[in-house]
């Protein structure tokens, strides 16, 4: 189905409207490349929301306490911490520039008052600690209040330093740097359910790391052929199972997914399960292999299903059924007739991500023209919504959009020929427990929530 039906995307069977909550970022027409958002991620509680951009910065938003005095106040997200995660580098051995762009952010489950996250660019992964400080020590023996050393001859009494209140300060400090393990560009990182290890994947290899050890990683997948001329596919995404710490999956540019069990062997070159949908020979074309390349793979929270995103669709797979997906949701089927021009302008290589809602009953992914799509798995209804400042009045309901692929266009429909392919939503995130979503549109972060009447 091209376009959307229905008035909103339900997350359990009851329809509700999505409405505008907030938008972050400048309104400028000319957007600096460094300001373009490249990843979005809620933490496990949903109280923190992190974004990374092409300039190597990480911005963390914190949800404010709900204001009981204001009707329908749901708690807004405001800037909590901003820090430079990665800087541009140069590999002198290979004469290559290494971009500072943040490819992925992954939160670690919170163990104490501090928060920890992993961020990665093409080559280097960093573990960051985000902590608060609202007290400072005063009354040192050897230093004065400004930090200057005191004259030892003037120190006549022993002082015990005391803690005094100060304005709240949020500090982001790098605790570990994991480098020099990837020859190719890192496309995925995933924290294991044991909370001690994580994996990182590039085009040809997947490495397993311990969070405490930076100088050693274990290569668990290596698909690099002895002769690079024989290379037929690359790894596009990888993720650990949410509950079984020995199981992970990785997807390929050929549209296949391999599930591996680390208990079987140290090097998981032989998969435990192989997921692939048979190709329909009648629909084979020059673009078939390009559009079948998987750009994202995500396990459901339950661990029973996984979702993959290719160029035109989202597929849901049952881990017990390798032969075909149990669900196929068409994201923008109306673009199938435009593949030639999308190939010429390189849009056909765009990597769209996808995400589940907290109960695994709905899924979300992005499209062009700042549209994003939602699919309800229970009712089989879907909706197309738009992230736009034109709808940015507080509590304004999002109006479902429809795309017309030809013939007579109705009043509220948009022609496929008038879609703006420079405006694309590649990165989205869904709050783990509530109906709150975050959508990255170029340099702006939109936050939407369900409308409570």
Curated annotation (Swiss-Prot):
Residues covered by region (Disordered): 385-406
Positions where Phosphoserine occurs in the chain: 285
Keywords: Cell cycle, Cell division, Cytoplasm, Mitosis, Phosphoprotein, Repeat, WD repeat
Protein name according to UniProt: Serine/threonine-protein phosphatase 2A 55 kDa regulatory subunit B delta isoform
Function: Substrate-recognition subunit of protein phosphatase 2A (PP2A) that plays a key role in cell cycle by controlling mitosis entry and exit. Involved in chromosome clustering during late mitosis by mediating dephosphorylation of MKI67. The activity of PP2A complexes containing PPP2R2D (PR55-delta) fluctuate during the cell cycle: the activity is high in interphase and low in mitosis.
Matching InterPro entries: PP2A_PR55, PP2A_PR55_CS, WD40/YVTN_repeat-like_dom_sf, WD40_repeat_dom_sf, WD40_rpt
Gene name of the encoded protein: Ppp2r2d
WD repeat residue numbers: 32-71, 97-138, 181-219, 230-270, 289-327, 344-385, 420-452
Tissue expression remark: Widely expressed with high levels in brain, heart, placenta, skeletal muscle, testis, thymus and spleen.
Protein family according to the UniProt entry: Belongs to the phosphatase 2A regulatory subunit B family.
Compartment(s) of residence: Cytoplasm
Residues modified to Phosphotyrosine: 305
GO annotation terms (biological process): cell division; exit from mitosis; mitotic cell cycle; regulation of chromosome segregation
Record-listed Phosphothreonine modification sites: 308
Subunit structure: PP2A consists of a common heterodimeric core enzyme, composed of a 36 kDa catalytic subunit (subunit C) and a 65 kDa constant regulatory subunit (PR65 or subunit A), that associates with a variety of regulatory subunits. Proteins that associate with the core dimer include three families of regulatory subunits B (the R2/B/PR55/B55, R3/B''/PR72/PR130/PR59 and R5/B'/B56 families), the 48 kDa variable regulatory subunit, viral proteins, and cell signaling molecules.
GO cellular component, one term: cytosol
GO molecular function: enzyme-substrate adaptor activity; protein phosphatase regulator activity
SMART domains found in the cross-reference section: WD40
UniProt cross-references to PANTHER family, sorted A to Z: PROTEIN PHOSPHATASE PP2A REGULATORY SUBUNIT B
